[in-house]
């Protein structure tokens, strides 16, 4: 099971790339993927409306960061441990922090989030939501990507998702909105309240919006 989960972040990254392919792109040029996580025997698929609410807190993050979050969400215990590690080593950042964590047996997606302490804290403080996000990421990958695009479209139509100094927003087709850092060397983590930024109220079960700023991304 661990070996299958270790490749989930890579698979999710490929799915994000696939979702961003423009209409008519040659599918043969992209690597074929197969499920990397066995569906839970008693798993009940999450319907679209509930899926939309589940991804709302991260749907407006840059694509590469979304992929890492989805992968890390399948390891909630590791996320909690990584958050505690960061808080215990507040004087460390960047490569130094990564070096200090080398002995930890964490998934690469969790290790990557060491560079984003605010994201780790959000995931650790909302473990119920994080676990639910991990379940759908492992069992309904394509549905998760579709939900992210639906929520981006809502924010875009509401005028709350646009290019700026931190991010570049490109609507490649009616169904595909790509979010990338304006500066490829700096990944900006937007702060927004998912209950209001999408134009209509969105309540995410198990997720607290306390101390989350409401901003146009």
Where are these regions (language model features)?
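Bacterial N-terminal signal peptides that target proteins for export
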Residues: 2-11
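Bacterial N-terminal signal peptides
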Residues: 10-19
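N-terminal low-complexity segments enriched in Gly/Pro/Tyr/Ser
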Residues: 21-217
